Amino acid sequence: PDMVVHASLPQGKETRGARKFLSCLWVSSKSAAISHTVINRFGWWLPPGIWPDEEDQFRRLVLSLWRDGARSFVLNSPWQVGLFTTEMLDDEKASFTAGPFCNISNPATVNVLKDMGFTAAIVSPELGSRDFLELPRLSPLPLGMVLAGCWPVGMSRYGTLGVRLNEPFMSPKHEAFWARQYGENTWIYPAWQLNLSAHKAELEKAGYSFFVSMQENIPASLPPVRRPGLFNWDNSLM
């Protein structure tokens, strides 16, 4: 099914799950502490930047989620399969998707991911239309893509000197951005969102199996920006 990645913990009816899409949460100590009775209703996304001093913590979180019934995981760096045991990876009821931060752009990469135990993959959101439309035909795994939402332009382990978190700041070209802290990393977002929804039918015809919406709690002070959100759709992959 399609995925909706939430930026914060769901409340009330949001914990019941939905038939049309899979609600997903980022793996953290806070998210893993939700009621054990609803953990299996969510997909669980591992952050792309897990540092050596955090590995043991995330390994414990993954094990805890697994014991409570979680079976749908999205890994945003290929090495993260090492956080799972062989028994987990061999479980036929489990799904291990290579996430969009794995920067998947060609079928050779997907072949390697399949050999590593991944069951599906989400391609890089920064491809051009030609590459987007060509990949599913050549892929050995079911493919998904980020269709809409907040996609970061970068992330850093270091602080944002001179920039306040959760408030807009301007680039030298007078483009608005904002930053938010997640764990040890600072994520930097543009004021405009990715939006390829107008091309959904074309992408479905090309062979994409599912689509992803990435939600964020956008700062109220962020100025409105009129941009189509196509990112590199009209460009070629360099």
Spans of features found by a protein language model:
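Active-site pocket-lining/capping segments in soluble small-molecule metabolic enzymes
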Residues: 1-112, 116-238
